[in-house]
Regions:
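Catalytic Zn2+-binding segment of zinc metalloproteases
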Residues: 15, 25-42, 60
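Alpha-helical linker/edge segments of TPR/alpha-solenoid repeat scaffolds
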Residues: 141-142, 154-155, 252-259, 283-292, ...
Length: 392
C-alpha cells in the first residue's frame, strides 16, 4: 500500500492523513472486494433470468422485451450501488474507531470530509444519492460529527511544523518540471513574511530549498536551509526533518562528504540510515561502500520487509564487487514489492552466475553458502508461485 504525494500535500494534519488510511485499510480488513465479487455472483442469475424472459417476451412484444431486459439490468446495478454505499459506511465506521484507538484526533475525519466536499463543490450538487457508489459527503460529515459527540467544538486542527514541512516536500516531489520549481521559489521570494504562522514559514522555506536544489542554485539552497534550521530550532521534530533536508541537499548537490558530516555518526532511525547509505554510495569509494553494505545488512536483519533497504543493499554490494549477493538482494527487493516473477528471474540469473564462478574456480566458501541460499529461496518462491496460480 502506498500514499499518493498529492494526498500528503492537501491534508492539513497527520490526523486527516490517518483518517484516509484508516478508511482504506478498513476496506482491506473487511474484505470488501471479495464481498463485492460474491454479491455480483449472487445477482448474476437474476440478470440472466431477466434477459431470458426478455427474449421469450420478444415474440409477443418487442417493447416488453426491452423493458424486461432493462429492468433486470437496472435492478442488478442498483443492488450493486446499494451494496457499495453500505461498504463505504462500514469503512467509515470501522475506520473511525481504528483512528481513535490509534491515538489520533477524531476531528481529522470531519476535516477530511469537509475538504472532499470543498473540492467537489463545483461539479457535485448532491442530486440522485441512490445512483452513487458512495454516500453523500454531507451525510458522511454528519455521521462523523455525531460520533464525536454533542457539544464538541469543531475548531480547525492546527498544522504541526513537521507536517507542514512534509507537505512541502510532497509538493516539491510531485512535479520535476522547471516551471513548477520556479513557482515554489517565486512564492518564497515574494510572499515570505515574518508575520506568517511558523508552520507556513517552515513550509515555504522547505519547498524553497528543494526547488533551489533542483535548479542547481547551491548558494541559495544553503542559505535557505540555514534560515530553516534557525526557524525550527525549538521544535525537535521539525529540527530533525530540517537536518535531514540539509544532508539530502548536500547529496543532491554532489557533495556526499558534506552530507555524511551533516548527518553525523549517530544513526538511530530509518530515514537517517537510508540517507547515510545513499551518501556513502554516491561517494563511489570502496571503503564507504563496504560500510554501506554492512549497515544495510544490519538493518535488514531487523527489517526484512524494507524494499528500499534491499535496493540500497544491492547497490552497495555491486560497488564492493560482490555480484552474487547483489543479485540476491535485488531478488529480495522484488519479493517485498510482490513481484515474484521478477524475483524468480533474478534468482535464476544468480544461479547461472554461481555456476560460472564455480566453473572458473572463483567461488569461495562464502560464495558456496550464498549459492545454497539462492537455491533455497528460488525453490520457495517457485512453490509460492505455483500455489498462487492454482484455481480455488
Amino acid at each position: 500500500m502506498g500514499v499518493h504525494l498529492g494526498l500528503i500535500a492537501v491534508v492539513s494534519s497527520r490526523d486527516e492523513l490517518a483518517s484516509v488510511m484508516a478508511h482504506e485499510l478498513s476496506h482491506v480488513t473487511q474484505r470488501h472486494i471479495a464481498r463485492m465479487q460474491d454479491q455480483q455472483g449472487r445477482t448474476t442469475p437474476f440478470l440472466i433470468a431477466g434477459m431470458i424472459l426478455g427474449v421469450l417476451a420478444a415474440s409477443r412484444s418487442p417493447d416488453a422485451a426491452g423493458a424486461v431486459m432493462m429492468g433486470g439490468t437496472a435492478g442488478t446495478v442498483q443492488g450493486q450501488l446499494n451494496f457499495s454505499r453500505d461498504m463505504e459506511r462500514e469503512a467509515d465506521r470501522l475506520g473511525f474507531n481504528v483512528h481513535a484507538q490509534a491515538g489520533f484526533d477524531s476531528q481529522g475525519f470531519v476535516g477530511m470530509f469537509q475538504k472532499l466536499q470543498q473540492a467537489s463543490r463545483l461539479n457535485d450538487n448532491g442530486n440522485y444519492p441512490y445512483l452513487r457508489s458512495h454516500p453523500l459527503t454531507t451525510e458522511r460529515i454528519g455521521d462523523m460529527q455525531s460520533r464525536l459527540g454533542l457539544g464538541k467544538t469543531f475548531a480547525p486542527v492546527e498544522t504541526s511544523i513537521e507536517h507542514a514541512m512534509m507537505a512541502a516536500r510532497a509538493r516539491a516531489l510531485m512535479s520535476p518540471y522547471v516551471d513548477d520549481m520556479q513557482k515554489l521559489t517565486d512564492v518564497l521570494e515574494k510572499d515570505f513574511s515574518p508575520e506568517l504562522p511558523l508552520a507556513k514559514r517552515a513550509s515555504m522555506l522547505y519547498a524553497g530549498v528543494m526547488a533551489y536544489t533542483q535548479q542547481r542554485r547551491a548558494a541559495q539552497a544553503r542559505q535557505t536551509i540555514n534560515q530553516l534550521l534557525q526557524l525550527v530550532r525549538e521544535d525537535p521534530a521539525g529540527l530533525r526533518a530540517a537536518q535531514w533536508l540539509a544532508a539530502d541537499t548536500e547529496r543532491r548537490l554532489n557533495n556526499p562528504t558534506q552530507c555524511l558530516q551533516t548527518l553525523g555518526a549517530k544513526v538511530v532511525d530509518r530515514a537517517r540510515v537510508v540517507l547515510q547509505t545513499q551518501c556513502r554510495l554516491d561517494a563511489k569509494q570502496a571503503a564507504l561502500a563496504a560500510q554501506a553494505s554492512d549497515a544495510m545488512q544490519l538493518w535488514l536483519a531487523q527489517h526484512p520487509r524494507d524494499a528500499i533497504a534491499w535496493d540500497l543493499s544491492s547497490q552497495a554490494l555491486l560497488q564492493t564487487g560482490d555480484r552474487l549477493r547483489a543479485m540476491r538482494a535485488d531478488a529480495e527487493f522484488h519479493v517485498v514489492r510482490w513481484d515474484e516473477v521478477g524475483a524468480i528471474d533474478r534468482l535464476r540469473a544468480a544461479q547461472e552466475l554461481a555456476k560460472q564462478l564455480s566453473k572458473d574456480g572463483k567461488l569461495d566458501r562464502a560464495g558456496n553458502m550464498e549459492a545454497s541460499i539462492i537455491d533455497s529461496r528460488l525453490r520457495s518462491l517457485e512453490r509460492l508461485r505455483r500455489e498462487l496460480l492454482q484455481p480455488y
